[in-house]
């Protein structure tokens, strides 16, 4: 049972903020063509075509015009920090010595980078969805608000950007940092700030939650804040028991029985549309509806084209930590623009939010705007980093004196865009590898380099999904045992092996804890360990 939510959020009518962060789609790719529905949107039109050449240094090379033919996208475009550098600045990343001052972000390298990664991919990268292809978003655009100046926090891949959503920093990560994935990222999060102030939060997961990237959320005291989405979310909505801060986590692995609904290519975005529809309708029918602000955004652009230059001036490093060599990224520029929705009965239909009015002259909307706005609405004491103190806040989207009574109760049924079945034998994406590494840390396999490597590089989606699920279930089981034995609520359970053994450790690194941990009784081979995990899960 979630504790009773706390009111008292001052002059704001919002007592519950719900956050859903989808995967890897740019603004133009997703909502650019929605300008035909609302001319206020900074999108794209046939009368003012946007384009890239396949060679940004040769103006006579093939020019690819941004189109409106997106449907099912496969494969996954490049979106590493190196790829994004080329997409944004129009010149390839120099692996020996990348330019720390690359100049104006002319957004001219998307087609070039796509062709460099795979011949013919520029067609997928330089296309967006027609509004009718995304019927759920079409209705949300017409009935609520979108922001057309929201940027990814880092010009990098999924995991660093997701870290900013709840902590306003990636703690120096620009891609998957295995050590930190195993140990958990140590920075303070908005979850702790809320908890310290007496507000409640809940994480509703459909697959082992990525919020366990944060080390502090692995503490025993936060176990009761994690809920199975399919069992608890609609129930809590119906009973009016949603906490003050709600995070909905998706299905990250594309399986035949449960297709991925995170919108990550090559997943079918119609599954993501179904998820948004389901979450919205549950919130809309809740007795808490008139106190809810629902935010949908995307972690990063996924390599897809966007025409708005990324901000490169005045962006503060959140905590003074630099990225890894050889670039030593200073976290002083943002990523590519991504779609963002604000949904509440306190918002006028068809609202378009552009850039923020402060708190600084060059402030922008980015993922750190979420904890910054949570701080504002709930009057929390401190910022998490220099980044959320700089980021624009969006409480001003609440403009009405009374809640609307005409918000749609249901949304349209999505259109299936993929003509094939889920590919369970596919290789893992980088983010799926991140989840596997995190799971190895939870399960106690952190020292088994061979196991981790094979899980990430030689295991298919279906088998990796089983491993992650098994690891999470083991972590929960051992954590519950430790809690029942009266262990300190600030401790973190450290699973030792495939037996029922565990040790409870304070918040310190796995490397420190390993000296005190019980060693496995037998050395299990990769295939036997994997097999035994799967049999136990099934």
Swiss-Prot record:
Entry keyword annotation includes Cell membrane: yes
Enzyme class of the recorded protein, top EC level: hydrolase
Spans annotated as Disordered: 91-112
EC number(s) on file: 3.1.4.3
GO term, biological process aspect, one: phospholipid catabolic process
Keyword terms of this UniProt record: Cell membrane, Hydrolase, Membrane, Stress response
A Pfam family it matches: Phosphoesterase
Cellular component terms (Gene Ontology): plasma membrane
Molecular function per GO: phosphatidylcholine phospholipase C activity; phospholipase C activity
Record localization: Cell membrane
Free-text tissue specificity from the UniProt record: Expressed in root tips, cotyledons, on leaf margins, stems, young anthers and funiculus.
Topological type in the membrane: Peripheral membrane protein
Knockout or disruption consequences: No visible phenotype under normal growth conditions, but mutant plants display decreased ABA sensitivity in seed germination, root elongation, and stomatal movement and have decreased tolerance to high salinity and water deficiency. Root hair elongation defects under low inorganic phosphate conditions.
Catalytic reaction(s) noted: a 1,2-diacyl-sn-glycero-3-phosphocholine + H2O = phosphocholine + a 1,2-diacyl-sn-glycerol + H(+)
Induction: Induced by auxin, zeatin, salt and inorganic phosphate deprivation.
Function: Non-specific phospholipase C (PLC) which assumes major PLC activity during inorganic phosphate starvation. Substrate preference is phosphatidylcholine (PC), but can also hydrolyze phosphatidylethanolamine (PE) with lower efficiency. Has no activity toward phosphatidic acid (PA). Plays an important role in the supply of both inorganic phosphate and diacylglycerol from membrane-localized phospholipids during phosphate deprivation. May be required for lipid-derived signaling molecules that positively modulate abscisic acid (ABA) response and promote plant tolerance to drought and salt stresses.
UniProt similarity note: Belongs to the bacterial phospholipase C family.
Name this polypeptide is given: Non-specific phospholipase C4
Gene: NPC4
């Amino acid at each position: 049972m979630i504790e009773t939510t706390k009111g008292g959020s001052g002059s704001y009518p919002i007592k519950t903020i719900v956050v859903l962060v989808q995967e890897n789609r740019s603004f133009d790719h997703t909502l650019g063509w929605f300008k035909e529905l609302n001319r206020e949107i900074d999108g794209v039109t046939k009368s003012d075509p946007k384009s890239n050449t396949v060679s940004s240094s040769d103006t006579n090379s093939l020019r690819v015009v941004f189109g409106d033919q997106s449907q099912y996208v496969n494969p996954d475009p490049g979106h590493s920090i190196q790829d994004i550098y080329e997409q944004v600045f129009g010149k390839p990343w120099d692996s020996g010595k990348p330019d720390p001052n690359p100049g104006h972000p002319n957004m001219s390298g998307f087609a070039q980078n796509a062709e460099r990664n795979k011949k013919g991919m520029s067609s997928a990268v330089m296309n967006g969805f027609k509004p009718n292809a995304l019927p759920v978003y079409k209705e949300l655009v017409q009935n609520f608000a979108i922001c057309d100046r929201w940027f990814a926090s880092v010009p990098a891949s999924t995991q660093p950007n997701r870290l900013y959503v709840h902590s306003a920093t990636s703690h120096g990560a620009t891609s998957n940092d295995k050590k930190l994935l195993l140990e958990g990222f140590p920075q303070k999060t908005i979850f702790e700030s809320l908890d310290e102030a007496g507000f409640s939060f809940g994480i509703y997961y459909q697959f082992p939650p990525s919020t366990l990237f944060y080390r502090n959320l692995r503490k025993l005291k936060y176990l009761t804040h994690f809920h199975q989405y399919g069992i608890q979310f609609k129930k809590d909505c119906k009973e009016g028991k949603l906490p003050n801060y709600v995070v909905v986590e998706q299905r990250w692995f594309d399986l035949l029985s449960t297709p991925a609904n995170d919108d990550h290519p090559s997943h079918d975005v119609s599954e993501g549309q179904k998820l948004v529809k389901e979450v919205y309708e549950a919130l809309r029918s809740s007795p808490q509806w008139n106190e809810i602000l629902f935010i949908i955004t995307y972690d990063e652009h996924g390599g897809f084209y966007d025409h708005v230059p990324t901000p490169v001036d005045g962006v503060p490093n959140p905590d003074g930590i630099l990225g890894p060599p050889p670039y030593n990224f200073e976290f002083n520029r943002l990523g590519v623009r991504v779609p963002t929705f604000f949904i509440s009965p306190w918002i006028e239909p068809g609202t378009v939010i552009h850039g923020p009015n402060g708190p600084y002259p060059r402030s922008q909307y980015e993922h750190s705007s979420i904890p910054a706005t949570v701080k504002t609405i709930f009057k929390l004491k401190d910022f998490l980093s220099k980044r959320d103190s700089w980021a624009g806040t969006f409480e001003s989207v609440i403009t009405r004196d009374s809640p609307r009574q005409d918000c749609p109760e249901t949304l349209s049924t999505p259109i299936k865009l993929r003509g094939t079945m889920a590919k369970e034998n596919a290789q893992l994406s980088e983010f799926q590898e991140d989840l596997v590494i995190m799971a190895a840390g939870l399960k106690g396999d952190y020292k088994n380099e061979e196991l981790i490597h094979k899980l990430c590089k030689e295991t298919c989606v279906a088998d990796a999904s089983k491993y992650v699920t098994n690891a999470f279930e083991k972590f929960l089981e051992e954590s519950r045992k430790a809690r029942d034995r009266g262990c300190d609520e600030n401790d973190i359970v450290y699973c030792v092996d495939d037996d029922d053994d565990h040790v409870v450790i304070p918040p310190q690194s796995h490397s420190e804890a390993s000296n005190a941990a019980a060693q496995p009784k037998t050395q299990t081979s990769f295939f036997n360990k994997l097999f035994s995990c799967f049999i136990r899960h099934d």
